[in-house]
């Protein structure tokens, strides 16, 4: 019994420590999102997410929209937007926003947040 214990201890100590070390995968390159205009936001909101950059753009679009709406609601004099119940899917609304931006060339260069609030007020007016 003692021999088996010593043998196992020697076997464990003699085995190479790094034999099964996991391989490190290369770090992905950073994704830069610099969206300022309604046109840039429209592009981000309609990208097909087939890569990390595509997923990042789509996630940015959704987070941007949510952040703009929440911030605007904190302002007592903010934009009057009344969402129906049940609310439409965010992806559908953001595609509508992109179509709205692309329907008028002058909208593409507007500040993204301003254009988004204008779209939302027109799309979901309070009556």
Segments (PLM) and residue ranges:
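Bacterial N-terminal signal peptides
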Residues: 4-14
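Sec/Tat signal peptide C-region and signal peptidase I cleavage site
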Residues: 15-21
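N-terminal propeptides/low-complexity segments immediately following signal peptides
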Residues: 23-27
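Short N-proximal segments of mature Sec-exported proteins
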Residues: 28-93
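Compact alpha-helical subdomains of small soluble proteins
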Residues: 70-127
């Amino acid at each position: 019994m003692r021999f088996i214990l010593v043998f196992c201890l020697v076997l464990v100590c003699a085995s190479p420590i790094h034999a099964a070390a996991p391989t490190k995968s290369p770090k992905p390159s950073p994704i830069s999102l610099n969206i300022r205009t309604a046109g840039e936001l429209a592009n981000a909101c309609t990208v097909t997410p087939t890569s990390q950059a595509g997923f990042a753009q789509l996630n940015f679009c959704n987070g941007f929209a949510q952040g703009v709406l929440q911030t605007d609601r904190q302002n007592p004099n903010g934009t009057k937007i009344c969402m129906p119940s049940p609310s439409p899917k965010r992806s559908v609304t953001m595609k509508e926003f992109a179509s709205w931006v692309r329907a008028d060339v002058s909208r593409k260069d507007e500040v993204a947040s301003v254009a988004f609030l204008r779209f939302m007020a027109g799309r979901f007016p309070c009556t």
